């Protein structure tokens, strides 16, 4: 019998991150010592009080059977308290919270709940490639909103084609931004919410890096007037609490969006292990100093790395205003970021993420993650220094 995958599977975009790290695995098989600054995988451990909460909860027999389909009230109440404490936003834990098994799962579910075949989704370019996966599975169409450095990597809503707006039903925003490290303020969110309301577009704000803005406290989209009228915010435990492997996230916002998400997930999942929910609750209610300390560590790494690159390589980089990524231009001797990243892997055994993974506007950039200790960052620079690449000419011709 011939097994024939569905048309949806056949039309899925390439999983670019998987392809990049497949190359890394192949190189590691040769015995090479790889310095991986490509993946946004936090290198520091989950705080002990969170791990201990999971350990204790795992011994609780009440969590060993099926739990509530839509999550335990104690976690939703902790989420509401967290949003009130951090952003001054009031969340109804019963009607305005949905739980996910990770941010990627959340993006997928939200697209399935908000898009019909033929609808248009507005996404940033460059932007997180997983937005495209859910849009494709919903059989919707993609419209790219270009992000440019001169505009602070914020989309210009006024330049979106009116014909596109007639069919647009969903817009993704993401600040602090992956991959550029740009941030948005309350005024921008107010403008975005008003625009979405005017054109009847659902707005999903991906707040995965919400803990990491360096000059001031990040604003939540939900602080904006009309935010709950038009959309929801997706928050991940992965970066804020060093819990990437735990696969936990949540959405908060418009109760009709949350209701649709919960109804969808009722047919796909049977809740989340109660021990994980207990640990997540401990994370949200714990001492905020953990996150502040983590932010200081990333800022120190960014300052150290960018200064070292300029001093030793002549490679000038704009420091990110948020996240833990450096968005760096590539030398003009390379045509694409894929070509540059492949060259670094082959000749220096270091990994960066090609900017093209995030869209065509990333062709001349790579994303470098500050998820390694300073000794590794120094070794990364030392290895590239031996290649004698013309970073100086990059500055002269591109600025």
Curated annotation (Swiss-Prot):
Gene Ontology cellular component annotations, sorted alphabetically: cytoplasm
Subcellular location: Cytoplasm
Oligomer and partners: Homodimer.
EC number assigned by the record: 2.6.1.-
An individual GO BP term: antibiotic biosynthetic process
Principal location: cytoplasm
Keywords of the record: Aminotransferase, Antibiotic biosynthesis, Cytoplasm, Pyridoxal phosphate, Transferase
Its biological purpose: Part of the bacABCDEF operon responsible for the biosynthesis of the nonribosomally synthesized dipeptide antibiotic bacilysin, composed of L-alanine and L-anticapsin. Bacilysin is an irreversible inactivator of the glutaminase domain of glucosamine synthetase. Catalyzes the reductive amination of the C2 ketone of tetrahydro-hydroxyphenylpyruvate (H4HPP), with L-Phe as an amino donor, to yield tetrahydrotyrosine (H4Tyr) diastereomer. D-Phe is not an effective amino donor. BacF associated to BacG converts 3E,7R- and 3Z,7R-ex-H2HPP to 2S,4R,7R- and 2S,4S,7R-H4Tyr, respectively.
Cofactors that this protein relies on: pyridoxal 5'-phosphate
Source organism: Bacillus subtilis (strain 168)
Reported induction: The compound guanosine 5'-diphosphate 3'-diphosphate (ppGpp) is essential for the transcription of the bacABCDEF operon and BacG, and GTP regulates the transcription of both this operon and ywfH via the CodY-mediated regulation system.
InterPro entries: Aminotransferase_I/II_large, LL-DAP_aminotransferase, NHTrfase_class1_PyrdxlP-BS, PyrdxlP-dep_Trfase, PyrdxlP-dep_Trfase_major, PyrdxlP-dep_Trfase_small
Pfam families according to UniProt: Aminotran_1_2
Protein name, UniProt field: Transaminase BacF
Keyword Oxidoreductase: no
Residues that hold pyridoxal 5'-phosphate according to the record: 103-104, 128, 178, 209, 236-238, 247
SUPFAM superfamilies per record: PLP-dependent transferases
Broad class of enzyme this protein falls into: transferase
Pathway(s) where this gene product acts: Antibiotic biosynthesis; bacilysin biosynthesis
Family: Belongs to the class-I pyridoxal-phosphate-dependent aminotransferase family.
């Amino acid at each position: 019998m011939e097994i024939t995958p569905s048309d949806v599977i056949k039309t899925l975009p390439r999983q670019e991150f998987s392809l990049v790290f497949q190359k890394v695995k192949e190189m590691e098989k040769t015995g090479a010592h790889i310095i991986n600054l490509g993946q946004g995988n936090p290198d520091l451990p989950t705080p002990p009080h969170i791990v201990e909460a999971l350990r204790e909860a795992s011994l609780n027999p009440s969590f060993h059977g099926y739990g509530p389909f839509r999550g335990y009230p104690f976690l939703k109440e902790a989420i509401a308290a967290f949003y009130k404490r951090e952003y001054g936003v009031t969340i109804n834990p019963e009607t305005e919270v949905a739980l996910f098994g990770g941010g990627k799962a959340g993006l997928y579910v939200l697209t399935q709940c908000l898009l019909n075949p033929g609808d248009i989704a507005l996404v940033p370019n460059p932007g997180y490639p997983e937005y495209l996966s859910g849009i494709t599975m919903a059989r919707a169409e993609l419209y790219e909103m270009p992000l440019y450095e001169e505009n602070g990597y914020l989309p210009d809503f006024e330049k979106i084609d009116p014909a596109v707006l007639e069919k647009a039903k969903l817009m993704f925003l993401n600040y602090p931004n992956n991959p550029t490290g740009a941030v948005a303020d309350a005024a921008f969110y107010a403008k975005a919410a008003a625009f979405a309301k005017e054109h009847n577009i659902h707005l999903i704000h991906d707040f995965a890096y919400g803990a990491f803005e360096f000059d001031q406290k990040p604003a939540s989209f939900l602080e904006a007037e009309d935010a709950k009228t038009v959309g929801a915010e997706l928050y991940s435990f992965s970066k804020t609490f060093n819990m990437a492997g735990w696969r936990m996230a949540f959405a908060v916002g418009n109760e009709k969006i949350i209701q649709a998400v919960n109804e969808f997930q009722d047919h796909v999942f049977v809740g989340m292990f109660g021990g994980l929910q207990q640990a997540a609750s401990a994370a949200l209610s714990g001492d905020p100093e953990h996150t502040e300390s983590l932010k200081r560590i990333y800022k120190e790494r960014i300052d150290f790395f960018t200064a070292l690159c300029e001093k030793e390589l002549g490679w000038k980089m704009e420091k990110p205003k948020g996240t833990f990524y450096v968005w760096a231009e590539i030398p003009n001797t390379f045509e694409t970021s894929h070509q540059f990243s492949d060259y670094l892997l082959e000749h220096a055994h270091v990994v960066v993420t090609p900017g093209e993974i995030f869209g065509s506007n990333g062709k001349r950039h790579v994303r470098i993650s500050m998820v390694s200790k300073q000794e590794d960052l120094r070794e990364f620079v030392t290895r590239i220094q031996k290649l004698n690449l013309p970073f100086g000419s990059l500055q002269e011709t591109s600025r």
